[in-house]
Swiss-Prot record:
It comes from Leptospira borgpetersenii serovar Hardjo-bovis (strain JB197). It catalyses: (4R,5S)-dethiobiotin + (sulfur carrier)-SH + 2 reduced [2Fe-2S]-[ferredoxin] + 2 S-adenosyl-L-methionine = (sulfur carrier)-H + biotin + 2 5'-deoxyadenosine + 2 L-methionine + 2 oxidized [2Fe-2S]-[ferredoxin]. HAMAP family: BioB (MF_01694). Gene3D superfamilies: Aldolase class I. Residues 55-278 form the Radical SAM core domain. It comes from the Bacteria. [2Fe-2S] cluster binds at residues 114, 146, 206, 276. GO terms for biological process: biotin biosynthetic process. Catalyzes the conversion of dethiobiotin (DTB) to biotin by the insertion of a sulfur atom into dethiobiotin via a radical-based mechanism. Pfam families: BATS, Radical_SAM. Its EC number is 2.8.1.6. This is Biotin synthase. One of its GO terms (molecular function) is iron ion binding.
Length: 358
């Protein structure tokens, strides 16, 4: 046996057997490059997932409350300036519209309602509008709310915190090294400053990544450890979708296996964080979507910002088929009747009912 092969097997043995071990950056690279068997990675990742989240999966539902009109130039985004993506632009929805969206999300079994607005960041007036909406949703529906509204200072974060916001999303998206390749209208440092502001206000930090934008394995490993240094409690892992109008020069090739390995990496580096399968799940994970839940404990359903996704019934069925259960905001479990029976309803499969007696 070669010295290199022996070292690789010893690394796999360590990750497999030492439940409380903390992986190094080198071990992270070996997870991504295939040196460690996928089943070994999943076994270790599942042990950590199960330790903190048991067999529960949290479903998040996005509400794109303002689309387009963005002055930023993030290369991955259909809403970026000069994108010519053909998306339907609209100003911020009214409080009543957003509230009704939240009502529907709760009916669908959402653990958290995620409000997303385009733009560099909210001004004072917009912050107050958002705070009013958040206050109503949390008080009247008892829902957990996450807001993604761009760059934020501590003063505005305090306003949102006072309204009941317990989670703010601001993705780092890629490594500091790779950031100039994807955006030139703001800096990586400005994004980390927003995380600092959110933390100082006492709001839980949600920050994640987009993989597949031409970054290296080292960049992905660096991102996982950077988020660990910020003690981020919720990490959405997006898989790049080449939407019309994007400006990513050399998108990477993402196989379903690599996507699962990436989720394992983020779980092993951030064992007690909520790891969420985000945009690109349907197209990149494909038949391994259910397998990915052995590393991740959360996912989005019912679509993304400008891309369709799996509907809630399909998502819930996949979760249950894999032996997991959808977790509700009160810690309970989504009732069984919202699953397979609805999936095979007459509306969805009329051919199954064509001989039904009237």
């Amino acid at each position: 046996m070669s010295e290199k092969m022996y070292a690789t097997l010893k690394t796999a043995e360590k990750i497999f057997s030492e439940i409380s071990s903390v992986i190094t950056k080198q071990e992270g690279l070996e997870i991504l490059n295939g040196s460690i068997p996928l089943t070994t990675c999943l076994d270790k990742a599942f042990q950590e997932r199960n330790r903190y989240f048991y067999n529960k999966v949290r479903i998040h539902i996005l509400d794109n409350i303002k689309n387009g009109y963005c002055p930023e130039d993030c290369g991955y985004c259909a809403q970026r300036k000069n994108a010519n993506s053909g998306i339907k632009e609209y100003p911020m929805k009214s409080e009543a519209e957003i509230y009704e969206d939240a009502v529907q999300a709760k009916k669908n079994g959402a653990y958290r309602f995620c409000m997303v607005t385009s733009g560099t960041g909210p001004n004072r007036l917009t912050t107050e509008r958002l705070a009013s909406t958040i206050r109503r949703i949390t008080n009247e529906l008892g829902m957990k709310v996450c807001l993604s509204a761009g760059l934020l200072d501590e003063e505005k974060a305090q306003v949102l915190k006072s309204a009941g916001l317990d989670r703010y999303n601001h993705n780092l998206n890629t490594s500091e090294n790779h950031y100039p390749e994807i955006c030139d209208t703001h800096t990586y440092a400005q994004r980390t400053q927003t995380l600092d502001s959110v933390s100082k206000a006492g709001i839980g930090m949600c920050s994640g990544v987009i993989v597949g934008m031409g970054e290296s394995f080292q960049d992905i490993v660096d991102m996982a450890f950077e988020l660990k240094s910020f003690r981020v409690i919720s990490i959405p892992v997006n898989f790049f979708i080449p939407v019309k109008g994007h400006a990513i020069k050399n998108p990477g090739i993402l196989t379903p296996e690599l996507c699962v390995r990436i989720l394992c990496l983020f779980r092993l580096v951030n064992p007690d964080s909520e790891i969420r399968i985000a945009a690109g799940r349907e197209g990149h994970l494909r038949s391994l979507s259910a397998m990915a839940l052995f590393a991740a404990n959360s996912l989005f359903s019912s679509g993304y910002l400008n891309v369709k996704g799996s509907e809630i019934i399909e998502t819930v069925t996949m979760i249950r088929d894999a032996g997991f259960v959808p977790e509700l905001v009160d810690g309970g479990i989504l009732p069984e009747e919202s699953g397979t029976e609805m999936l095979y309803s007459e509306k969805n499969f009329p051919e199954l009912y064509k001989f039904k007696k009237s």
